[in-house]
Structure formats: C-alpha cells, structure tokens
Amino acid sequence: MSGPARIQLLSLRLANQIAAGEVVERPASVAKELLENSLDAGARRVDIEVEQGGVKLLRVRDDGCGIAADDLPLALARHATSKIRELEDLERVASLGFRGEALASIGSVARLTLTSRTADAGQAWQVETEGRDMEARVQPAAYPVGTSVEVRDLFFNTPARRKFLRAEKTEFEHLQEVVRRLALARFDVAFHLRHNGRSALALHEAGDETARARRVAAVCGPAFLEQALPIEVERAGLRLWGWVGLPTFSRSQADLQYFYVNGRMVRDKLVAHAVRQAYRDVLFNGRHPTFVLFLEVDPAVVDVNVHPTKHEVRFRDSRMIHDFLYGTLHRVLGEVRPEDRLAAPAAVAPPAPASGAAAGEFRGQEEMPLSATPPAREPARPAAWKGAGAGYQAPSPRPARSAEAGGVYREFFAPLAEPRTEPATRTGEESGISSGDTSLGDTSPGGIPPLGYALAQLKGIYILAENAQGLVLVDMHAAHERITYERLKTAMASEGLRGQPLLVPEGLALSQREADCAEEHAEWFQRLGFELQRLGPETLAIRQTPALLRQAEAGQLVRDVLADLLEYGSSDRIEAHLNELLATMACHGSVRANRRLTLPEMNALLRDMESTERSGQCNHGRPTWTQLGMADLDKLFLRGR
C-alpha cells in the first residue's frame, strides 16, 4: 500500500491553465475580457477581427491610453493590474476589470501577442507568449497610440477543452452577443466587428438621444424600439433608465434582456425576480419580458468581486434595490394609455424593410399594439370630447349618445362596474412619466377618443371601432375582465384585508432562521391578514388567515413566503394568491361571448378601457385590443400599387 501523496506547488503554467478554466470558456470569454480592457483604457473606437469563430484568430484593437513598454511583461503576469491598489479600491471599483489575471489566463491556452503604445512614446512595443513558461521579451513594433491584442489558436495546448467548443457559427454568435452587450453599455464608443473578412457589426459612436435609439434598434431590432417604453427615474441615490418592452412584445425565451449596473452587464436573480413581479399581471404564461435597463448606484453599495467572470453582483441593501426596480417598472407598465400606444414613436432608427402587415400580410399577435393605463388620470367621459363630431362621418354615436351610453353600460354591468377611487397623482420623478395636462381630449386628433367609436359587434366576441388611425378590434370579454379585475383590486386595497381567526391554530415547524424571519416581519404578515405567534425556537402557530384565502393551504403559503423573504427580502406570494382569486371572480363576473351589446354599451366599454390600468391585456396576459391602420388595410388590399 503506497503512502499518502505529497503536497507540492503547481507549476506556473498549470496554475494559469486552471485559472483559465474559470475565465476562458470559449472565444466569447476571451472577447469579453479583451473588450473590457479596451473600455477601461478609455478607448473611443474598438475593432474586433475574428476568424473561424474566434478559435483561429481573435484580434482586438483600440485607441485607448496604451501600456508603457516597461509594463508589458507585467501585463501578462497574474495578479498584476493598474486598476486597483488597496482593499479600499476594490470596495469601490468602477472599472470593468480589476483582477489582473485575464491576459495571463488567455496566454496560457493560446498564442498571444500584445502590442501597445502610449501617447508620449516614440514607438510601439510588443510582447508575445505561447501558452508555456517563457520569459517575456519586449521588442519594438509599429502601431499607433492604443493597444492591440492578438489571440491565435485558442486551446491549442489543451485538446480536451477544444473538444467542447461548438460549431464555428455557434461560437461566433456567442462572441457577437458579447460585443452587442458591451455596445449597449457604452454608447460613447464605436464598435466594428469582422468575421472571416466580412463586416458583421458596425456601430458608430452614439452621442445623442437619436443616435442611442439607433444603436438600441441595431442591437435589439427596430421592433423592440417601436414596442418599448423609455423610462428614467431617480430616487434615494438610485437611477434607473432605459427601455422596457410592452407586455405584448414578449419572447418565448429570455434572450432580449439586458441589465447593467454602473455600466457592467450582470445577470442577477434579484433583478430577475423584481422584473418578473412587475410583469406578473400582464404577461402571458410562458412568455418572457424584454428590456434594456441601466441602474446607476454608488459603487460602494455593490460588490462586483463575487464571480470570476464578474457576471454576478451583490447589493448591500438588496431589498431596497428590489423594491425600487419592482415599483418603478410596475408603475411604468400601468401608466400606458391607448393614446400613448398610438402616438408616433420618438427618436427611432431608420425604418426596416417592410414585413408582416406592412408587406401585405396580417400582423401576428406578437406585434399587436396594446394599452395599459395610468391610475393618475381621470376616467374618460365621452361627452367632454372637444369637437368629437366635427368632420367625423363614421356611423357611430355622437358625443351626446356616448354620454348616454355610460349610464346604460353602468346599469347593464351593475354591480361590478362600481365607481373606482383613483389613486393619488404621482409626480413625474417618482413614476418616470412627465407630469402635465393628461386629459384624453388633448391627445386625440380631431377630438376622437383613442379607441374611437364602436361600429359593430362581430360574432358576439369582438367589437369593431373606428378611430383616427383606422380600425380597432377589441376582445369584449378580455377587456371587461381586466376592467373588473382592476376595480376589485382597488376595492380590496382601499378596504384592507379582513382576517379570519382559526378555531384551531395551525402549528408550523420551521428552521430557527425562518422563525426569526417570521417574527421580524410579523407586522407585515398582520397587514396581509395573517396572525403568526412564535411558540418556540423552531415553531410557529398560525392563528388567523385572510378571509379570501380560507381555502388555501396556509402552512405551505407561509413557508413559501418566508423562503422568498430570506432569498429576496420581499415576497409577493400572498398578493399573487389574492390576485388569482380576484382574477377568477373577474372572469366569471365579466360579459360573456355571444352576449349582444348595443352601440352605447360598446362605446362605454371603450371609454372604460381608456381609463383603466393595464387594459391592454386581460388577467392572463392576452391582448385585449389591436389596431389596423389605414396603411395596413390598404396594403392588405394592394391599394395604391
């Protein structure tokens, strides 16, 4: 029997290759590290040249500050960097890179050539490494001010790693996605990407709003920008800005989600949870929201030294960040009105080639416009529309008849259509929407309401209406379901949750950490209708539950809520259960298909949609209405050709 293996130091080459396993996964990983170095160097233009998906060649050239000749050998050494000096620097790091190990890791698994020149140097200098222990030799070279890093034959000395690489096309797609993500992080830098001698991406410096919108459209597609809401909110030292996609512009995969913290692309479960909560009421099951968001915070309150790839971060006050993200997005999604959706978009990219309805085909569900609505606005009253009848020859009710329709509609749908208590008006700073005159009459050409006036009912399911843009199609049941649902939620919020004491308290065995969390949040549980009593270090008693949730499994619900509180600092499970119940009530209490409505009743429903939050989607996330403009209709019938 042999003795125990002796402990010995690893060779520098092996240590670097082990580190490379964490940092260098594929060519895209190399591109990320090199591009981050270029951006940290103050580059205003970055050129990326790729061959065979980045395996044969990956060259990154920039016009940054460059590296001094004496520092070139150190640049290839591990744990050598110019970005931090002390522990205090690490706690407030603002640069994308700071570990000082990327070039050493890359150089251990590839043939690397580093060429650089500073502004005060008479010439450039170059250093090479070939994946083995070798003394770096600095030699003169020809290059302008800036840096060029050339990586050839990736994983040439680690065949096992090379076997795990995908096809050339797949590897290049990953690399191109890295360039796109960094291009969104730095609008002030131009990016040019070439693959096998062909230009794959050319993004010029974006210095103003219009140019930034063009870059977003180039990276995410023109359709995203057309279906996105711009936001900018600043509060308590936090600033959130960017674009959030409308609920109907959702995806089957989470592949159009870009989130940045102080310019650093991150993937964070806390952020994902906050976004998921904000879209919960308006997103169809199995769909994913789209967004490009930038969060700016004090570097001291976020820890970026969590993962070797720096994709993950840790916030000092995660609950505050979560609540800020959720509250901001939830308000923005609820503050869209039909007239906002129908308004021409602001600075956008040049129009893309015609497709869908624009090319003579019927527009798919994913491109349908939608509305969702701000509670701060007054409900629309058709009689108040200015000049509603002037020049409007459609066979639809005049404003006087529309006013009469309100009474008919309220009587028809009583008692569900109870008057709502509108929440207090929020300031533009809090909501991300500029304040000002919000009367619907000021936003519609010719005084015509955003959703127009009803023309007819189709098969007892759809309402056909005419507005200034053309034809509006409304799903009658889905629209009324959302209106009823929002009113039920408002009523519950104003009246509070009534608790129902249990005849026999339910015991709950938990961990001590969960029990401590329950005790800490006892007042929060009380507001939601629960009464929890601690019986021991790891035991709770549920003495009261919300009356609306008397059929729910209270014990499991409390466990799930505590798990969320420990993980994210907040939980929406109780609210989700309540909303699910209210949604069921709204569904059963809404007008059904094949129920014939009069024109006044249809018009009253349209007016209610214009003043109801999130009326663009039903409770299940399906669209409630869509618009076919005159141009769309003309193309369907080949008019003007």
UniProtKB/Swiss-Prot annotation:
Keywords: DNA damage, DNA repair
InterPro entries cross-referenced by the UniProt entry: DNA_mismatch_repair_CS, DNA_mismatch_repair_MutL, DNA_mismatch_S5_2-like, HATPase_C_sf, MutL/Mlh/PMS, MutL/Mlh/Pms-like, MutL_C, MutL_C_dimsub
PANTHER family: DNA MISMATCH REPAIR PROTEIN MLH, PMS, MUTL, DNA MISMATCH REPAIR PROTEIN MLH1
MF term (GO), any: mismatched DNA binding
Record organism: Azotobacter vinelandii (strain DJ / ATCC BAA-1303)
Function as written in the Swiss-Prot or TrEMBL entry: This protein is involved in the repair of mismatches in DNA. It is required for dam-dependent methyl-directed DNA mismatch repair. May act as a 'molecular matchmaker', a protein that promotes the formation of a stable complex between two or more DNA-binding proteins in an ATP-dependent manner without itself being part of a final effector complex.
Gene (name only): mutL
Region Disordered, annotated ranges: 345-445
A single cellular component GO annotation: mismatch repair complex
Name of the featured protein: DNA mismatch repair protein MutL
PROSITE patterns per UniProt: DNA_MISMATCH_REPAIR_1
The keyword DNA damage is assigned to this record: yes
Listed Polar residues bias regions: 432-442
GO biological process, one term: mismatch repair
Domain of life per record: Bacteria
Pfam families xref list: DNA_mis_repair, HATPase_c_3, MutL_C
Family named by the database record: Belongs to the DNA mismatch repair MutL/HexB family.
UniProt-listed CDD domains: HATPase_MutL-MLH-PMS-like, MutL_Trans_MutL
UniProt feature, compositional bias: Basic and acidic residues: 419-429
